[in-house]
């Protein structure tokens, strides 16, 4: 049963590099979006207008934290990463139907 030996020199280096590049791009994209979301949250934290309050009905707690915390909305607990409202325009994540 000596046929079960493995020869690691026959691994295709091109496919290995391609897989590493794809993984690196995906991880970098996730990190960039996360950092971008935190930067957007910092810029919109003290800048809440009536328009920002209205955005909470479409995207809950996207930027203006004080208004989200005052609304006693316990139907959707806050988990995961905040999505800035300008990344996904027009996306309706709330359960209510629009007017």
UniProtKB/Swiss-Prot annotation:
Which GO molecular function, any one, fits this protein according to its record?
channel activity
According to its UniProt entry, the function of this protein is described as: Putative viral proton channel. May play a role in virus entry.
Which stretches of this protein does UniProt put in the Virion surface compartment? 1-18
Record text on subunit structure and interactions: Dimer.
The entry's keywords = Glycoprotein, Hydrogen ion transport, Ion channel, Ion transport, Membrane, Signal-anchor, Transmembrane, Transmembrane helix, Transport, Viral ion channel, Virion
Query: Which sites carry carbohydrate?
Result: 3, 7
Q: Which family does it belong to?
A: Belongs to the influenza viruses type B glycoprotein NB family.
Name under which the protein is recorded: Glycoprotein NB
Quick check: keyword Mitochondrion in the entry? no
Q: Which species?
A: Influenza B virus (strain B/Victoria/3/1985)
Instruction: State the Gene Ontology BP annotations.
Output: proton transmembrane transport
InterPro entries from the UniProt entry? InfluenzaB_glycoprotein_NB
